[in-house]
Structures are given as C-alpha cells and as structure tokens.
Amino acid sequence: MFYWIYERMLLSQIQVLPRHICFMISGADLAAAPEKCVQVTGWCSELNTLIARQDLPADAKNQSAIQGLTFHINQLSPEELARFLPEIKKISSIARLVLHYGTTEEVSGTGLEVVVAIGKSGREEITECIRRLAENGIQPSEIDEKTLESCLTFRYDPDIVVKTGGDHLTDFLIWQSVYSELFFSDVNWKYFRRVDFLRVLRDYQSRIRRFGK
C-alpha cells in the first residue's frame, strides 16, 4: 500500500519527461533479468498514455511524451544472443523495435520506437562512418558535424543515459551522448523497479541542461 502511494506521489511530481532515454546494460544484467527491457518499455508507454489523457494541446502532448528508448547491451556471446533474442523481440508486441546485432538490423512492431543495440561500440560506429565518407569520395574540407552525423548508425541524441548497478559507462553513443544527462543508479538491473524509473525521471527534470555551455 505504501509503495503504491509513493509511486503516485512521484508521478505527481514529474512534469517534464526526457524525449529520448538510453539504458546501458551488460550481458550479465540481461542474463539476470531478460524480461526487464520489455517491462521498462511498458513503463514508458504507460507514461505516454497518461500524457495523452491530459487536457493539453496536441503539440504540447507531443513535446511532453517520451519519443524514443534505447537499450545498449555491451556484449553477448553467440550462445547468449540465441538465448535472449526471443525475449528481446517481445518488445515488438508493445512498441516499434529496431534491433541491431552484428551486421543485422531488424524492424518490427508499431508505436514508441525502441532501439536495442547489442555489442555496438561508439568507436566502431564512428570508424564505420569515416570509412563510408572516404568510400563516397568526400573530401576532408567537406566534412562538418552534420556530414558526420548523417552517416551515423544511431541518429539521435539521448536526453539522459541511465546506468544501473554501477558508476561506469560503455563507449556506446560517444558522439550522440556528449551533452546527455547521466544517471547512475545503485539498484542492479534485475531489481530495477518502476519506482526507481520514476526517480530517474524526477531527477532529470530537476537538472539544468547546459549543452556544453
């Protein structure tokens, strides 16, 4: 009963939602709670449903809603990948799943866009981007930030990057997350609850984003 009241209190305090959230989890995290990605996706969808029910102009609702969610899983062995892919793919039953692993990209489902990137490093992404620019004959003098961003695999900037159960990050989205807010939760991924997610959102809205200034 108290837990439910506390959740309601947290919900009432959240007025500003990040438009894009990125979770960085390890293979061990996924093995401990393979269903958690689906759960977190459901929490985001529920929040968007609550916003849709509010008496707000359409533009305000779109600005307030969570528009994208990313899960980066730093590394999985081929055996682990085969074991956990069926659970990950369940996300497509409640959202639009964009799944990256190896050289494969699969898209399925509709609704909130959820990107799951397995074993993709930021260094690898930027290296591939530079290689494509060179193959296309782009001259160094023609390259600027927009040119580089146009050939990145992941073309979005997360508002907040969340790491559960630790205080270290992987090198995923090293270009895109340069101005992102960081949140380190002392709760391990397996035990990460809806109330912990709401605490992340409450903390996010209290921050003053400076975007490098």
What are the residue ranges of the model-derived segments?
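Flexible, compositionally biased loop and terminal segments
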Residues: 1-213
